[in-house]
Amino acid sequence: MELICDNISFAYNKDVQVFQNFSHTFKPGITVLKGYSGSGKTTLLKLLAGYLKVTSGRIITPTGHRVTSRRYHQQGVAYMFQGINLLPLMSVERNLHLAAEMAMLPRKEWKPRCEALLRDLGLVELRHRRADKLSGGQAQRAALARTLMKAAPTILLDEPTSGLDDGNTDIIKKLVTQDAAKRICIISTHDSRLLELADDLIDFDHPVSC
């Protein structure tokens, strides 16, 4: 199982070249994209998620689906956006169920998967609380739970511990490590606390081209 960037290039316009002839093979485990804000980490995640299109080269997905296809978005990849991406008027539990529904996860799998994530992320007592009533750390954990509800082979996490204290960060680190052995997990971060998780590290503090 591999997610492959094959000689990809991307530019927002003729004056802003972000990637040029970049190649990398992502394998099961955790790849950390390290670097300062604006270095291209989030752009790469959006390319891998199919939200942006490469200007040249190709991305080969583990499922064989085109990176821009609806099936890939539904079942091939799960993306945790930078910032909280929860529906604010829905409960934590309903946010998780909606993620499962959108990913076409069999309904019989919803409850056990939801219960495990609520337990592992310390959200059991918050399951019926509206997302807009959560603290920052609680909302970040709920957003991760929503992402992991998808049984996708590729998980993309954009700054998952941004602004979190050590306690909340440790909870997220533990679950990501536990989940990553079976999936390709790519984390964009400038948080040094996450570097120890890396099976593979791409340093965006230096030019990303080859």
Residue map of PLM features:
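Hydrophobic anchor residue at the start of the ABC signature
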Residues: 144
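Conserved ABC ATPase "signature" region
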Residues: 108-126
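Catalytic Walker B motif of ABC-type/P-loop ATPase nucleotide-binding domains
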Residues: 155-159
